[in-house]
Amino acid sequence: MDPQDCTCAAGDSCSCAGSCKCKNCRCQSCRKSCCSCCPASCSNCAKGCVCKEPSSSKCSCCH
């Protein structure tokens, strides 16, 4: 199970797996993995984001 918080500093890359679901992840390289339909630049990612459809480019927190 993934940790609640990734251990890296904000903006740094980290070793989270592609399936990482860290809820408070601050890593630019990992953030996009917290919700597959969020863009990597989404600052709200991992805050209850829900993909609107499977394989969708839209999610509830960034669009």
Swiss-Prot record:
UniProt note: domains: Class I metallothioneins contain 2 metal-binding domains: four divalent ions are chelated within cluster A of the alpha domain and are coordinated via cysteinyl thiolate bridges to 11 cysteine ligands. Cluster B, the corresponding region within the beta domain, can ligate three divalent ions to 9 cysteines.
Q: What positions does the entry give for a divalent metal cation 1 binding?
A: 6, 8, 22, 25
Region annotation (Alpha) ranges:
31-63
Family per similarity comment: Belongs to the metallothionein superfamily. Type 1 family.
Q: Per its UniProt entry, which superkingdom is the organism in?
A: Eukaryota
Q: Extract the PANTHER family matched here.
A: METALLOTHIONEIN (PTHR23299), METALLOTHIONEIN-1X (PTHR23299:SF24)
Q: Which GO terms describe its cellular component?
A: cytoplasm; nucleus
Which of UniProt's keywords are assigned here?
A: Metal-binding, Metal-thiolate cluster
GO aspect biological process, one term: cellular response to zinc ion
Record: residues binding a divalent metal cation 4? 34-35, 45, 49
Q: What organism is recorded for this protein? A: Columba livia
**Record protein name field:** Metallothionein-2
